[in-house]
Amino acid sequence: MSSKAHTALVELREDLDGDVFAPWDPGYDAARAVFNAAVDRRPAVIAQCAHADDVVRAVRFGRALDLNIAVRGGGHSVAGMGTNDAGLVIDLRRLRGVTVDPAAEAVRVEGGATWGRLDRATQPHGLATTGARASTTGVAGSVLGGGSGWLERSCGLAADNLLGVELVTANGDRVRASADENPELFWALHGGGGNFGVATAVTLKLYEVPEFAVALVVYLPEHAREAVRTYREVVASGPLEAGGAVVWRTGAPAGPPLCRVLLTYAGSEEDLRKLAEPLLALPHESQVVTALPYAEAQCAFDAPPGLRHHWSAECLSGAPDDFVDAFCALAETLPVPTATRHTLFPLGGAVADAPADHLVPYRDAAWAVHPFGSWADPADDERCTAWVEEVRAAVRPWSTGAVHLNFVGDEGRDRVRAGLGPHNMWRLGVLKRRYDPDNVFRFNHNIRPL
């Protein structure tokens, strides 16, 4: 480290109310670890910011030393976009405050808070909003990437519920974006991710969700195709409050993959039981139908720490019978025994009803396939990664060509265009030039300045 860099680091330690870690500091390895254990990077400096002013100081520090800058919120990026080698990581995990305004049905969430913290804060008020399907995911990164979750068919995507963003730009300025303040920037933040600055807080619209219930029905492979078709019809004919997923994964402890149909409902257990009757009428191995606090339902798919991950997705125009056959056949090649999941989510409803000017381009998709590779042994890296890509290739005949960027890693510029819409790229590039002309914030699904 040069004398200039050493002096700047000493000054950063003095200036920040949060903590600063360099590779020789105790706690550095714990601070650099991210959700995906396959990502093993060694930043030169980790600035764990305590508040927005710390973020300003960290950005200016990184710019002064010409360091690559990554921004970590929940740390859930499968590609490890919240970290880097030999650069600066601006770590927001200490910015985790959640402030609920029940009268306004709104919540302000700091940039490092997770969905678990938000859900636990809003639940006592009978309120909720669309959030990621894992409670450990960061709110800000999820929302700014679009934000898919159990409530999206009735409440829209997380980005659809965005009321405001507090941002630190590439030159260290603090700005706000909303429908009334910097509206063009606000538009870009409905899916444009971290390209325009560090989100130190977001404000979201809340909805009344006083009751929530789930039905989980497990089927043997020979009954799976009928179960998936039945689930398709239940969702299509049911209320928008109904959602859920089809999830194939290894049977315990290491048996063949089993098909799990999860039917979620933002309403009463009694009403859910009526909706689930066609699924329960099929031959099945086990069933659970119960009322469940929404915050607990959000934890149902939390992956244990320490696993290696690779995942991707395709948005689908529909789920006809030939697709169902192909989807279920792919489960036969699921890497066993691992924690890998082969998932199918329904879209539609409020997702498709957003204004035409909204950024996310997959509004017309009816379903999303999300092969979710998770495993513990590095020896399984190749086969689990290959399986995810095989699923993508196999379902491409039904793909709309669009993709939800929160569901993919670093898959190249064509996938970024597919996730943001080719018709939006010029407009986004112009905004990028205005707010980040040097592409300081490029450890993301990157938009290049024009």
Segments (PLM) and residue ranges:
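Soluble FAD-dependent oxygen oxidases
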Residues: M1-L450
